[in-house]
Amino acid sequence: MLTLPQRVLVIGIARSGTAAAAALGARGVDVVRADRKLGNDDDLALLDGVGLVVKSPGVPGENPLVVEARAGGIPVWSEVELGYRLLAAPAIVGVTGTNGKTTTCELLGAIFRAGGRDVVVAGNVGSPLTAARSAEWIVCELSSFQLEDIHELRCRVAVLLNLEPDHLDRHGTFDAYRDAKLRIFERTDVAVVPRGLGLDGIEFAADDPLPAEPRIPGAHNRENAAAATAAARAAGIDDVAIAEGLRTFPGVEHRLELARELRGVRYVNDSKATNTAAARRGVAAFDAPLRLVLGGSLKGEDFGAFARELEPRVRRAYLIGEAADDLARALDATGVPYERSGDLGTAVRAAAAAAEPGEIVLLSPACASYDQFENFERRGEEFRRLVQNLS
């Protein structure tokens, strides 16, 4: 039985923080809420009488409230750590990695349901873990931010999909980012890992034989399917159910999602491609000539190698957001023509006006969205709206 302190500080007022505060309040805890931007000397008084700090994923460890709490011996938990303890140690399949987490989690949910299991998909996708209902199994998407402050969270099956540079603006170095990701294995029963990384566990790769071919397109999605297959088998799901899930799962929003086909031109929403590794996979998923919408907020990535890989496939790039200058410099060293569109609406209209039948207008921005949109979902929704309004 989890004993909670009388007073808890929740830092972050977005989705995870709101769910954590609601879960604590429902258990009679006096909840103090703080925006993640707080942290001057006056704000530190929020810690008075607090016995636990719960921080949302967007709150860095350098936040003054977090630093002061740790210095004072106050425990600091991530929202998923709180959710795990409130659910009394549920059976979790945890999924982390740089790219493919949401697709793999939702695919696992489909596979578990095909196998007749009671399953909830939660964490960084679906509902926050503190808002999830009790279930036989929980498939939990875990970001590096969420894994930074776990203490007892234990996965029956822990999956690492891939490891490529990302969130360096938050973690500082790739080593720090990798170390956060690998925390998923600290207390796991079964580890599922990519072949070739040199990690202990059940290995998977894109060329693994599968019970059925996945419905969703792209070589990267076959790799996601291989990871899901290995994880499902480790959880006791038979190949009949796995095959059913692979054949029927339609994919998820904002990941190589066909938004519209108009006069022979396909418009594809891959707004979730918030780093170059994800955008590289998006570009590689198609053989047709591409008109590629790139840009958004910067995350500390070097675009040079990514830009060089675009030349054979991309007919023209349309640059948006604060990353436009960096992307332009990278593209100047290649033969890829580009134009500075500034915003998504201008980019979509320009690409649509120039696109020829058989081409694809692809939003796969290789950047986060926060300079112009609340999140990648809002960016993808705006892309869909713009595309539907084309005539």
Positions of the model-derived regions?
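Conserved beta-strand positions in the Rossmann-like core of class I SAM-dependent methyltransferases
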Residues: 9, 32, 120, 318, ...
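Phosphate-binding loop of NTP-binding sites
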Residues: 22-27, 38-50, 57-192, 199, ...
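Glycine-rich Rossmann-fold phosphate-binding loop(s) that bind the pyrophosphate
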Residues: 13-14
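Adenosine-cofactor binding site in Rossmann-like domains, unifying the SAM/SAH pocket
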Residues: 35-41, 209-213
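C-terminal helical cap/extension that packs against the catalytic core
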Residues: 304-359
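Nucleotide phosphate-binding/pyrophosphate-handling subdomain across enzymes
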Residues: 2-8, 18-23, 27, 89, ...
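Residue-level signal for inorganic ion chemistry
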Residues: 24, 53, 95, 124, ...
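Short internal beta-strands
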Residues: 32-34, 192-195, 293-294, 313-323
